[in-house]
C-alpha cells in the first residue's frame, strides 16, 4: 500500500476534500485509512466501567485510500 501510518496526506475527493492530516491507522485488507481530523463521525456509546457516563463521542472514521494523496512521508530515523 502506498500510504503508511504517520504519513501526511491531503484528501482529494469526498466531503472533506482539501483537508490535510496525519495517517493514524491503515487497513491494507480493505484499502481504508484513518486520518486525524478528517471524516469525523459521532458514535453513541453505552455507559461502561471505562466511560461511566457514556454519551455521544466524536471520532475519525475511515476513508478509502484512493481518496488521498501523500504530501510528506514519515521520516524514518532507523537508517
From Swiss-Prot:
Sorted UniProt keywords: Ribonucleoprotein, Ribosomal protein, RNA-binding, rRNA-binding
Record-linked Pfam families: KOW, ribosomal_L24
Record bears the keyword Ribonucleoprotein: yes
Domain of life: Bacteria
GO molecular function, one term: rRNA binding
This protein's name: Large ribosomal subunit protein uL24
HAMAP family in the cross-refs: Ribosomal_uL24_B
SUPFAM superfamilies with a match to the protein in the record: Translation proteins SH3-like domain
Family: Belongs to the universal ribosomal protein uL24 family.
BP term (GO), one: translation
PANTHER family: MITOCHONDRIAL RIBOSOMAL PROTEIN L24
General function of this protein: One of two assembly initiator proteins, it binds directly to the 5'-end of the 23S rRNA, where it nucleates assembly of the 50S subunit. One of the proteins that surrounds the polypeptide exit tunnel on the outside of the subunit.
NCBIfam families: rplX_bact
Assigned GO CC terms: ribonucleoprotein complex; ribosome
Assembly and interaction partners: Part of the 50S ribosomal subunit.
Record has RNA-binding as a keyword: yes
Amino acid at each position: 500500500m502506498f500510504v503508511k501510518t504517520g504519513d501526511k496526506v491531503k484528501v482529494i475527493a469526498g466531503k472533506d476534500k482539501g483537508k490535510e492530516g496525519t495517517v493514524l491507522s491503515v487497513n491494507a485488507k480493505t484499502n481504508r485509512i484513518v486520518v486525524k481530523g478528517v471524516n469525523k463521525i459521532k458514535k453513541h456509546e453505552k455507559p461502561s466501567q471505562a466511560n461511566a457516563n457514556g454519551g455521544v463521542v466524536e471520532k475519525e472514521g475511515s476513508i478509502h485510500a484512493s481518496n488521498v494523496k501523500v504530501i510528506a512521508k514519515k521520516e524514518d530515523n532507523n537508517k
